[in-house]
């Protein structure tokens, strides 16, 4: 049976249309995973928060992930060998990922900067008395030489058959 989500009795054509309609971020004991787990867990949390207020960001993130998937599939099919047509397609994917990485990472950095005052104001609810909490966003994408770093990683990408640099690695 197909999952159906409705608002005021009207079903959405796509479930993604519901995201952001009820802007809510839930805090649970699992949030400690944000500290203990990998950067992927933290990225997903940030992405989920931003998606609550920016449909544009969510749409861009989905496009980025689709292009990333296509690039990774191409890298796998190339089996470490670069030829003319594959090189041209890889260039196209690279240009799109470089541009989108910069945009996505900047929105994430802006979110973290906007979230820090809320975190500071509510620190007492989050941590024990002798502890403090802080938050920073570190991204290779926001570095001045990101485009060069991305392009220089192509040899490694061909060997590993996946994209090793971009906003999906923040």
Predicted regions and their residues:
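Conserved NTPase motor "head" modules and their coupling/switch loops across ABC/AAA+ ATPases, GTPases
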Residues: 81-170
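Arginine residue identity/basic-tract feature
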Residues: 2-6, 14, 36, 42-43, ...
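Short C-terminal domain-edge/linker segments immediately following a structured domain
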Residues: 35-37, 55-58, 66, 165-169
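Nucleotide-state sensing region of NTPase/ATPase domains
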Residues: 1-41, 45-53, 57, 116, ...
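Charged, alpha-helix-enriched surfaces in structured cytosolic catalytic cores
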Residues: 17, 40-44, 59, 66, ...
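Long, non-coiled-coil amphipathic alpha-helical linker/lever segments
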Residues: 46, 53-108
